Structures are given as structure tokens and as C-alpha cells.
Regions:
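Short, charged recognition helix plus adjacent turn
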Residues: 1-5, 48, 66, 76-80
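A short, Lys/Arg-rich alpha-helix, primarily the initiator
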Residues: 1-23, 29
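Short alpha-helical elements of helix-turn-helix
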Residues: 12, 28, 44, 58-61
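DNA major-groove recognition helix of helix-turn-helix
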Residues: 34, 50, 60, 79
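DNA major-groove recognition helix of helix-turn-helix/homeodomain DNA-binding modules
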Residues: 57-74
Length: 80
């Protein structure tokens, strides 16, 4: 399929935060957490975000941070 242009910079960290959570959070569970915040992103789209194939809005960025209990700066790779 070749190289696909990355459409976001948070995908890798979303995956890391989701998998390293205790207990681990599935893409389906993350989708439910986002929906509670009014952000409708399905589990298949979360997979695309994690792979860098789908763009993320600022509202979605904030919702991901809240749902995963991490900072926006961490998701953006600005803080360690």
C-alpha cells in the first residue's frame, strides 16, 4: 500500500496510554468514554487515529486526554 501521510501526531501516544492503563483500555471502551463527553468516535476510527490515518480536532484532542487521564501536552509529545 506504500507510505501513508500521517494525519495526526497523537496516535502513537493514544495507543500507549490506552494499552498501559491499568486495567488496559480497549478501543471500544475508549470510544464509550469519548461518547460520554459528547465526542462520537467509533472504535474503528480510534484505530485509524492510532495509525495516524485520521485527523483529530482540538475538541477530540481534549476529550482523548480526559478519557485517558493524561495531559494534552503529553499527547502532543511536548512533555515526557
Amino acid at each position: 500500500m506504500g507510505n501513508v501521510e500521517k494525519r495526526n501526531i497523537i496516535g502513537d501516544r493514544v495507543r500507549v496510554a490506552r494499552i498501559s492503563a491499568n486495567p488496559k483500555v480497549t478501543q471500544l471502551e475508549l470510544s464509550a468514554r469519548l461518547q460520554i463527553q459528547g465526542v462520537m468516535i467509533g472504535d474503528s476510527t480510534i484505530g485509524k487515529i492510532e495509525n495516524g490515518a485520521s485527523a483529530v480536532t482540538d475538541i477530540q484532542l481534549l476529550a482523548f486526554a480526559k478519557a485517558l487521564n493524561v495531559s494534552v501536552l503529553w499527547l502532543l509529545g511536548i512533555e515526557g
